């Protein structure tokens, strides 16, 4: 009779242990599956790897609600500056399903693969995307930069 109680208590203990483990796994599972947010790196390879692009505000800081000038630097994957590129710019807020409030343009080639982008404006806080369609001697490619305010 004592051995039956021993097995019963051992079984209950094992059941409690497994229930505790399952509770921890259940509570932690949502955290494991959560996205960490958009990639906000300022330098990256283009979609097909033809170019390495970097993007930064000319004034050094992102300002909400102000018309800004940014610098886009384009290099080949071998590191040579990309000269004479045609650049089309679009974008918007993916979570709000609207485009940019302005029409940014590549206005000047500054040398060493650097292009001035004028007319960038972020009217509200949140996640913004800027899409660059690049056409140059090396070919055509795209790159997308995320900006979170």
Feature roles, as predicted:
Residues 5-15, 20-129, 133-149:
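Contiguous segments within soluble domain cores/interaction surfaces
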Residues 1-3:
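N-terminal secretory signal peptides that target proteins for export/translocation
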């Amino acid at each position: 009779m004592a051995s039956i109680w021993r097995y019963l208590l051992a079984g209950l203990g094992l059941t409690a242990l497994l229930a505790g483990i399952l509770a921890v796994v259940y509570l932690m599972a949502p955290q494991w599956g959560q996205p960490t947010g958009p990639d906000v790196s300022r330098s990256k390879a283009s979609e097909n790897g033809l170019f390495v692009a970097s993007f930064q505000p000319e004034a050094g800081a992102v300002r909400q609600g102000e018309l800004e000038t940014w610098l886009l630097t384009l290099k080949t994957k071998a590191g040579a500056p990309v000269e004479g590129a045609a650049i089309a710019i679009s974008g918007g807020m993916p979570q709000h399903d609207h485009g940019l409030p302005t029409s940014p343009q590549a206005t000047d080639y500054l040398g060493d693969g650097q292009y001035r982008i004028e007319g960038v404006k972020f009217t509200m806080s949140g996640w913004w995307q800027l899409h660059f369609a690049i056409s140059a001697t090396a070919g055509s490619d795209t790159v997308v930069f995320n900006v979170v305010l």
